Amino acid sequence: MKFLDEAKVYIRSGDGGGGSVSFRREKFIEFGGPDGGDGGRGGDVWVETVNGLNTLIDFRFQQHFKATIGTHGMGRNRTGANGSDVTLKVPVGTQIFEEDRETLICDLTVEGQRYCLAHGGNGGFGNAHFKTSTNQAPDWANPGLPGEEKTLWLRLKLIADAGLVGMPNAGKSTFLASVTRARPKIANYPFTTLHPNLGVATIDEREFILADIPGLIEGAHEGVGIGDRFLGHVERTRVLLHLVSAQEEKVGKAYKTVKHELEAYGNELTDKPEIVALSQIDVLDEAELKKKTKELAKACGKTPFQISAVTGKGMTEVLRALRDIIVEENAEEKPAKVPKQRHRDIVVADEGEDVGEDGADDQP
C-alpha cells in the first residue's frame, strides 16, 4: 500500500428538513387545528481512528464527503427522519487542520477516538409550534437550517515507540528489516527510503514499534534532499535511535549534521532520549573501528553502541536499551483515555438565533 501522510478533503453536513404546514382534517371535527411536524436534523460528518491503517492514501481517491439532509416534517405531527451521518476512517495519529493548514482542530491519538467535524443543520419547526390563542391556524413553518461546509487538511504523524534517524545509507532500513518483519526497500544508494516504514520489534518478550524515516542531509530543514517533512513521524516517539554509518569518512561530522537538522526542525525532538550507535561495523578492521568509535563518542558525548545488522553484533544490546527507555517513559505517563464527545441535543431555532446545547432557548 502506498504511503500518504497529508490529504485535503471537502466535507458538508446535511441540511435540516423543513417544518410542515398541515391541518388536521377529520370527519365531524370542524376545527382540527395545525398538526405540521418538525423537519429532521441533517447528518453530521465525523472522523474516527481505526486500527490497521497507517496511511491516508484512501483520501487521494475520494476527497468529497457529504452527509444526507433531514427529511421534511409531515402532517399528524410527524417529525421527519434525521439525515445519515458520514464517518471518515483515519489512522491513529491523524491531525485535522483548518484550510489554512495551521489551525489545529483535533489530534486523534487513541484508537476509537471520534470527533464531529461538521454538525448537521437543525430541522425547522412545523406550524403546530406557532399556534397561539390569537392565531389558531398559523399557515407558516420554519425551513431547516443549512449544514456546515468546510475544507480541511488531514496530516498523519505515525505512532511509534522509537524512531530511527540518521543520514542516507546509515543502515536504518537494514536495521528495521533485521529486527522486525517489515520489508523496507534496501539498496546501496542514498534516499532508498522515500517514506516512513513501521515495524514491531520484540526483545525479552516485550514488543515495541520502530519507525524508520528517510535520511537527513545538511540543509534538510531548508528543503534540501527530501527535506524534513517526515520528521513529524518521530515527534511522538519515546526515544530516538541515531545511527551513524561506519563507512562515513567523518563520523563525528555526520552525527552533528543530523543533530543540527533535528534542532532546526524544533518541536522538542532534541529533548527526547537518544541512543547513538555506530552501524555497519562489519566493514571495518579493529583499528579503524576503535578510531571511529572514539571520534563518534567525542561528538555525541556518550559511548556509542557498535552494531552490525549483517552479523547481528550489538543488536540485542541496542534493542534492550531502547526497551528500557520506552518502559521508563511509559511508566511516567498516565494511560491515555478516549476523549468523549456527545451528540448535540436536537434543537430547532429561527435562523440567526443562538441555541445552547441544552435546548433552553429552542423556542421561536
Swiss-Prot record:
* Segments forming domain OBG-type G: 160-327
> What is this enzyme's class at the first EC digit?
hydrolase
* Keyword terms, alphabetized: Cytoplasm, GTP-binding, Hydrolase, Magnesium, Metal-binding, Nucleotide-binding
A single cellular component GO annotation: cytoplasm
Where GTP binds, per the record, is at: 166-173, 191-195, 212-215, 279-282, 308-310
Q: Which residues form a coiled coil?
A: none
Q: Where is this region: Disordered?
A: 330-364
Give the EC number.
3.6.5.-
What is said about its interaction partners and assembly?
Monomer.
What does this gene product do? Answer: An essential GTPase which binds GTP, GDP and possibly (p)ppGpp with moderate affinity, with high nucleotide exchange rates and a fairly low GTP hydrolysis rate. Plays a role in control of the cell cycle, stress response, ribosome biogenesis and in those bacteria that undergo differentiation, in morphogenesis control.
Instruction: Specify the protein name.
Output: GTPase Obg
